[in-house]
């Protein structure tokens, strides 16, 4: 009974072990432990195998001894039965029975001793069986641990598979990103080269623009200096114009006062002969005799006047006509704003009062060699400039300095023929000509000022455009440097991604190596488990066959 009990317990333990092993084998669950844990488990399994073999041997020996004892016990029982049968025989066999009893007592004592020894051995076997049960419990614990480890392994395997797939996907993404980054790096290199070329071109343009700006600045400075000189000259000319204007106003006022006084006093007509006086006032006296009208018939004329010859009268009439034409030419020029009578329009003027005024007026007249077109052109351009002083001077100079007509030139030729070398006033003429500024110089100065101002304006516009282009070029250079920095950062990122890819490839290779090692270890464990199962099955079969 006890042997059958222990056999059932061992069968149950072996069935539990087999079920755990079947779970491990069928589920392809491979424990993933460190090398130290695997080595300790291998040692425990080997120790259990050796102990199981020793226990199986001891169990076989004990079974054999039990069988022998049972056989001997059955023989002893048969002998006792025989003795009991012999006791029922007659008393003749008493002596033989006594001997047999003594032998049986002796055998009984031997059997009792043997039974005590067997009981001791049985107790030892029970202790050993208890130890085996403890070891079987250890085996059960180990099987449970194997199950937990197998579940952990399955979980870790699934996690590892997911991580492996994730790493493969990351590697694929990194490869794609690396390819894209390589393509982007090539594009960035091309863009960088183009940006560098643009920067070099812009730098060259900037240098040329700076040189052009320097040249324009020099031209502007030179034009400003020339403009300052022109302004100084213009100021001096304006001062001269003011002086001339004051002189002209003073002369006009004197002439007006003289004319008004002469008109009120009604002076007598003065007629001279064709002779030339010896003093320097001949010119004025001659001009006074030119205006001969029908006032000769006036009863106020003195009777002792010298008659004029016919040749002289014809000559005087021609001169009078030329003189009228000359003053008609002067009339539209508007010498002053107030209407004034011509100084030679009166028939009778006192010689003593108007001599100085006429001399000054004639001294201020220009020479016949000056061109009328030059003076009129300078006056019109001066009026276009809008400068008050220049326009005022132009109006005065066009009135005073306008060239004479053909009649006036004839009159001047007549005067040159009639005047003696000693009767003229060259000092006054030279003085009047020196006070009048050159209008052609004013015209040149005005045109030069306008041209320089236009050039200054265009130069300022060009400088502003050049500054804008310079700022744009600087901004493009800054953008190019920023793009270059971005390209450098992207290159660094590509290098980092390349290093990460290499590290991941190394980790993948190492994981593949460890996976191969683990798979080999699992294959070895599967073989060991199969051997253990076969061994346990053989032991169970042996125990079952002996029972």
Swiss-Prot record:
Keyword Nucleus: no
InterPro entries reported in the protein's UniProt record: Growth_transcription_reg, TMF_DNA-bd, TMF_TATA-bd
Swiss-Prot/TrEMBL keywords: Coiled coil, Cytoplasm, Golgi apparatus
Cellular component, GO annotation: cytoplasm; cytosol; Golgi apparatus
Residues in coiled coil: 53-264, 439-535
One GO BP annotation of this record: intra-Golgi vesicle-mediated transport
Subcellular location as annotated: Cytoplasm; Golgi apparatus
Pfam families, A to Z: TMF_DNA_bd, TMF_TATA_bd
Transmembrane domains' residue ranges: none
Family label: Belongs to the SGM1 family.
Name of the protein described by the UniProt record: Protein sgm1
Phylogenetic classification of the source organism: Eukaryota, Fungi, Dikarya, Ascomycota, Taphrinomycotina
């Amino acid at each position: 009974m006890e042997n059958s009990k222990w056999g059932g317990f061992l069968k149950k333990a072996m069935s539990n072990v087999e079920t755990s092993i079947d779970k491990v084998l069928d589920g392809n669950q491979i424990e993933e432990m460190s090398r130290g844990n695997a080595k300790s488990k291998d040692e425990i399994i080997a120790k259990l195998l050796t102990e199981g073999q020793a226990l199986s041997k001891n169990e076989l020996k004990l079974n054999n001894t039990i069988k022998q004892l049972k056989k001997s016990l059955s023989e002893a029982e048969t002998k006792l039965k025989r003795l009991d049968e012999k006791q029922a025989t007659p008393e003749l066999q008493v002596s033989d029975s006594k001997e047999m009893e003594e032998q049986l007592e002796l055998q009984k004592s031997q059997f009792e001793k043997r039974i005590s020894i067997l009981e001791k051995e049985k107790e030892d076997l029970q202790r050993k069986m208890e130890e085996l049960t403890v070891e079987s419990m250890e085996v059960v614990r180990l099987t449970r641990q194997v199950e937990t480890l197998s579940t952990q392994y399955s979980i870790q395997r699934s996690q590892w598979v997911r991580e492996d797939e994730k790493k493969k996907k990351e590697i694929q993404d990194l490869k794609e990103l690396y390819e894209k980054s390589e393509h982007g790096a090539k594009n960035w290199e091309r863009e960088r080269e183009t940006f560098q070329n643009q920067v070099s071109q812009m730098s060259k343009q900037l240098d040329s623009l700076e040189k052009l700006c320097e040249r324009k600045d020099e031209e502007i400075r030179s034009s400003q200096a020339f403009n300052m000189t022109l302004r100084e000259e213009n100021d001096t000319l304006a001062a001269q114009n003011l002086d001339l204007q004051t002189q002209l106003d003073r002369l006009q006022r004197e002439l007006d006062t003289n004319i008004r006084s002469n008109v009120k006093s009604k002076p007598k007509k003065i007629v001279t002969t064709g002779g030339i006086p010896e003093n320097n006032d001949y010119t004025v006296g001659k001009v006074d005799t030119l205006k001969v009208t029908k006032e000769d018939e006036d009863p106020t004329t003195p009777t002792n006047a010298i008659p004029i010859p016919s040749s002289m009268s014809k000559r005087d009439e021609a001169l009078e006509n030329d003189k009228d034409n000359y003053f008609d030419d002067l009339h539209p020029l508007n010498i002053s704003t107030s209407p004034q009578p011509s100084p030679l329009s009166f028939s009778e003027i006192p010689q003593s009062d108007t001599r100085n005024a006429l001399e000054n007026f004639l001294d201020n007249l220009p020479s016949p060699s000056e061109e009328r077109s030059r003076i009129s052109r300078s006056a019109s351009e001066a009026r276009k400039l809008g400068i008050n002083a220049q326009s005022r001077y132009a109006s005065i100079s066009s009135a005073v300095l306008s060239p004479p007509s053909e009649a006036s030139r004839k009159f001047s030729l007549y005067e040159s023929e009639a005047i003696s070398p000693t009767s003229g006033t060259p000092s006054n003429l030279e003085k009047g000509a020196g006070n009048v500024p050159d209008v052609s110089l004013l015209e040149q100065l005005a045109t030069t000022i306008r041209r320089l101002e236009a050039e200054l304006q265009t130069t300022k516009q060009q400088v502003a455009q050049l500054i804008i282009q310079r700022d744009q070029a600087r901004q493009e250079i800054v953008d190019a440097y920023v793009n270059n920095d971005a390209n450098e950062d992207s290159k660094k990122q590509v290098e980092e991604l390349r290093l990460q890819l290499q590290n991941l490839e190394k980790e993948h290779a190492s994981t593949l190596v460890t996976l191969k090692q683990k798979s080999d270890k699992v294959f070895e464990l599967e073989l060991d488990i199969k051997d253990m199962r076969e061994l346990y099955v053989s032991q169970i079969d042996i125990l079952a066959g002996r029972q």
